[in-house]
Amino acid sequence: MKLGINGLGRIGKLSLWHHVSRQFFSEIVVNLGRQVGSGLEDIAATIEKDSSYGRLSTYLHGHKGGRVIENLNEAAGTMTINGVPVTVLREARNPKDIKWQDNNVRMVVDTTGVFKDPTTDAGDPRGSVRGHLQAGAEKVMVSAPFKIKSKGIDMPDDAITTVMGINDDDYKPEQHSIVSAASCTTTCLSYMIKPLMDHFGADRMLTASMVTVHAATGSQKVLDAVPAAGVTDLRKNRSTLNNIILTTTGAAKALGLVIPEMKGIGFIAESVRIPTSTGSLIVLVLNLQDELENPIKRDLINSIYKDYAATTQYLKYSAGQNVSSDIIGTPEAATVIESTETHTRTASLKVNLDHLKSCNIDAGSGPHILEVPVTQAVIYGWYDNELGSYTNMLGDLTVSVAERMV
C-alpha cells in the first residue's frame, strides 16, 4: 500500500522519517504543493538534515550510516529513501486537486495543520480535509485536533478523534474515513489521566487542571513582528528566541473526545511556550475525593503509573531526574512520568451546607459544616512533542488504520 503525506513541516518531515524507517508502506507520496529551492536536490537536503534530531542517516543507521537518499529524478520527482520509493508532488495545495488517485494513494496523512474542520465541503476553494477523499484517498489521518469553525454543528459521523492505546478501539473502519490523532499535548495528557481514571474512577475526580510548558512551534515568530489586521493576541508576534509566551491549548476539550468521562469533570488547561526546539512538560493537578481509612499518598500515585507502564509501551515511568533534552527522541513514549516530583497533600474540604439551599439541595438537620477529605495530587509528565512522542504515536495509529483497510 502507498502512503500519502500532505505537508513537509515538522510533523510531515518526521512522519516521512518514521515511515521510511518502518517500511510498512511500499511507497510514499509527499505533497508539497509548491516549488522548493532549486529543485529535488534541495528537497532531499531538507529531508536529510534536521536541527533537532540530526541527520536522517544517523537516525536510521547510527553514526556509521552512509547516504540513504538516492536515485533522484528531477523530471519524475522521485527518489529512494532507505530503499523506499518516494514521489514528491509540487503542484496543488488544495487537497481536492492533489493527484492521489493518479498515484494510487489510498491513505493520506495531512500534517499541514491547516485543514482541521471535517464539516467543510470537499470543494471549498480554500481547501478542506475532505478534499483528500474527493482526490482519491479512502482514509485521511489528521495530525491535529479537529476544529469546527461554525458553532452548533456536530462532529460528522465519519470523523473520529483517537489516541493510540487509549481509544483506538472506537475507530470503525466501515464508518470512519477521517481520523484525528489529537495533539501532542492531548496524547501525553491521555496517558497521565487514564491510569488514574482506571484506578479511582471518575466519581472520585473532583477537578483537574494542567499547564503544558511547551517548546516553540512553527507558528511562532523568530523575531518580533507587526501583527496582521484583526489579530487580538499580540504575544504570538513576539520573538520565540528570548521570551516565555503565554498562549492557549485545546487539550482539555480534545481530552473529552478521547476519554469521555472527563467531560463531567471541571478541567482547566493552560499553555506556556518556552524558547526550546522540542521537548515539553505537562504539570497535572488533580483533586481527588479521599478515604480516611486509606489515604492517597505519593507512593500510591507512583505505583499506579509504574504498574500501568508495565502494560503498555506508550507510558514510561522514570525514577530518575530528567531535563527536557533527555526526552528528545524517546521512542514510542507518549508520556514519561517524572516520579521523583509527584506530590500529594490531603486536607479536609469544609462545605457549608447552608450554601446548598440556593442549589435546591436539602441540607437537612445536623451540623451545618461538612468536612470531606480531599487529596491534591501533582504529577509531572514529559513528552517529545515532535518525533519521539507524537510522530511515533501518529505512525502507529496510521499503520493500525491501514492494516484494517480492505
What are these regions, as identified by a protein language model?
Residues 167-169, 183, 221, 249, ...:
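Short capping/connector residues at structural and topological boundaries
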